[in-house]
Amino acid sequence: MINITLPDGSRREFESPVSVMQVAQSIGAGLAKATIAGQVDGQLVDASDVIDHDASLRIITAKDAEGVEIIRHSCAHLVGHAVKQLYPEVKMVIGPVIAEGFYYDIYSERPFTPDDMAAIEQRMQELIAQDYDVIKKVTPRAEVIEVFAQRGEEYKLRLIEDMSEDITAMGLYYHQEYVDMCRGPHVPNTRFLKAFKLTRISGAYWRGDAKNEQLQRIYGTAWADKKQLDAYILRMEEADKRDHRRIGKAQDLFHLQEEAPGLVFWHPKGWSLWQVVEQYMRKVYRDSGYGEVRCPQILDVSLWQKSGHWDNYQDAMFFTESEKRTYAVKPMNCPGHVQVFNQGLHSYRDLPIRYGEFGACHRNEPSGALHGILRVRGFTQDDGHVFCLESQIESEVTAFHQQALAVYTAFGFDDIQIKIALRPEKRLGDDATWDKAEAALRSALGVCGVEWQELPGEGAFYGPKIEYHLKDAIGRTWQLGTMQVDFMMPGRLGAEYVDENSQKKHPVMLHRAIVGSMERFIGILIEHHAGAFPSWLAPVQVVVANITDAQAEYVDSVRKTLANQGFRVSADLRNEKIGYKIREHTLQRVPYLLVVGDREKENGAVAVRTRSGEDLGTMTVSAFIERLQAEQAA
C-alpha cells in the first residue's frame, strides 16, 4: 500500500505504485487537466513519474511559480523542435530558463534573421496546436550518446562528456520526432505552452568563451496564460521607452563605442548628473563618520595573492607588466583600504575606523554580458570599509541599514527587499568563522526589526552579505547595496589593533556600498524616472528662455542669479519661436522652463512652466529660488 500525503494534510492510499498524474486524477478531472508536474518529498518530478513509496506530494499547476518555470523550460525545447524542422542542418546546444523567460543556443552556419525568428515562432504555434504529449524516457548513458551521435548533435555529445561518470542514465524528452536531454521536469502536453513569445536573437559563444565558436541565441518568454503574457509585453514596451541607452542619447548624457567596450564616455550633462549623485553620497560619508581615501588603480599581484583574490577572482581581473613585475588593475577596493589601515598603530579604543572611497575598479566581464552602463568593465563604487571589534558589528550594520534606506528613499525608491547571501562553495575560512559571520548579520537585521530572505551559496568568497533589492517604477527588481562581514581578509593582509590586554588582534572588516557601481546606479535612475529626474537630481534644473532679443540681457542675468545660488541652469537665447523652445526642453525632461517676455523683464519676474506642461504663473526670481531650494535633497 502506498500512502500519499497532500499539502492540506489529507492522505490517499493506493494499492500499487502510482504516478503524479494518477494521484491528480483521483482528486478530480479538473486538477488532472491542470497538472504540469509534482513535488514529491520536496523534489520536482514529471507528472508521469511514478511514486513507489510513502511520500508527500504537491501537485504543480500553472498557478505555481515552479509551474511557470517548467512552462518556460518546455518552451525552450519547443524552440528546438521548431528550429530542427525548419533548419535541420543546425546543431542544438543548450536551452535554460532565465528570469521571466528562456533562451536556446544553436550553432548555425549563418546568423538567424528577424524573418527566421518569425518563422520559428509560427512553427511553434503550429506544433502547439497539434496538442501532442511530451514523452519522457529515462535512458542509459550509452544509449543517449548513441541517440545524439546518430542525429549529429555534437554539442550534446560534448555536454555529456562533461558530466560526471556517476551519471549512468538521463532523461530524454520527446517532442514527436525531436528529442532533447534534460533533468526536467517538463510539461506533459504542448497545450500548456500557448502563452509564449520569442523576443530577440543575439550572438553567444560556446561555453561563454570568445575564443570558441559563435552561436545563435534565441530568447523568448512564456507565461501561465495570455493575460500574463500581455501584461509582460506591456511592461517590456514601457521598459523599452525607459531604456537608459535611448534616454542617454536623447538627453546627451553619455555614449559607448566599440574602441572601449564596457567603458563609458560621459558628456557634460551626464557628468553633471554623476556629480550630483557623488556629492550626495560624499555627504553620506561625512555624516556617517567615514574618512574619504584614495588608493592606487594598480597593485602588485603579490597583494592580490595574499588577499585571496588571486585564487578566487583572477579570471575577472586585468593585468599589466612593467620592469618584470606583474600588476593587477584593481577589481575591488578592499585590499587598498587595508593598506591605509596598516600604516598606523591602532588601539581597540580607536575602533571603529571607517574609510570611504569613490573607487574606480575594472573587471574583465565577457563582452556578451555587457549592457549599456548597467553592466560595464570599468566602474566606480561608493565603497566603504569599517574596521571594528566583533562587539561592534551589530551597531555598525544597524547604522548602515538605516543609512541605506534613507538614501534609497531620497532617490525615489520605497519598495525594498532585504536578503542575506550565505557561504558559497568556493570560499576562504572554516565553517565556524562563517557561522559567526552569518549569525552577526541575522542578529543585526533582527535588531532592525525587518524581514529578510536567505540565499544559500551566494555570498562573497570572503564573507556573507546583506543585499538590498529595490523595485523600480515598472516593477523590476535591482540588487544595489551590500553589507558584508569579513573575518578573513584582515588576517591575510596583516591588519591589527592592540586590545585591552596589550595583545595584537585582527579587527573585523565590514565591506559596505549603498549605490554600488555608480554607472549602474545612474542607469537604474534613468530608467526608474524615465529621464524625468526630480529637480534636485536633474542634470539641468532650469532653462531660462527669451521670447525676443529684447530680453536677452535680462535672461542672462536671471541665469547668473540662479547659477550663483548653486543651481544647474542654462539660457536659451536662440532665434526660435518660444513654442519650439518649450517643446524641445519638455522633451529633454528639464524640470522648469522660465519664459521671459517684455512684461517679465519690466517686473523683474519670470513665467514658470513645468515639464508636465503646468503653468505656475508669474513669480519673482527670488520666489522661484525659494521654491527650487525647498525641492533639494536634504
Curated annotation (Swiss-Prot):
Localization: Cytoplasm
Ranges of residues in domain TGS: 1-61
Stretch list, region Catalytic: 243-534
UniProt cofactor note: Binds 1 zinc ion per subunit.
UniProt xrefs under InterPro entries: aa-tRNA-synt_IIb, aa-tRNA-synth_II, aa-tRNA-synth_II/BPL/LPL, Anticodon-bd, Anticodon-bd_dom_sf, Beta-grasp_dom_sf, TGS, TGS-like
Main location: cytoplasm
Gene Ontology biological process terms in this record: threonyl-tRNA aminoacylation
EC numbers, comma separated: 6.1.1.3
One GO cellular component term noted in the UniProt record for this chain: cytosol
Keywords: Aminoacyl-tRNA synthetase, ATP-binding, Cytoplasm, Ligase, Metal-binding, Nucleotide-binding, Protein biosynthesis, RNA-binding, tRNA-binding, Zinc
NCBIfam families: thrS (TIGR00418)
Summary of the function given for this chain in its UniProt record: Catalyzes the attachment of threonine to tRNA(Thr) in a two-step reaction: L-threonine is first activated by ATP to form Thr-AMP and then transferred to the acceptor end of tRNA(Thr). Also edits incorrectly charged L-seryl-tRNA(Thr).
Subunit structure: Homodimer.
Protein name stated in the entry: Threonine--tRNA ligase
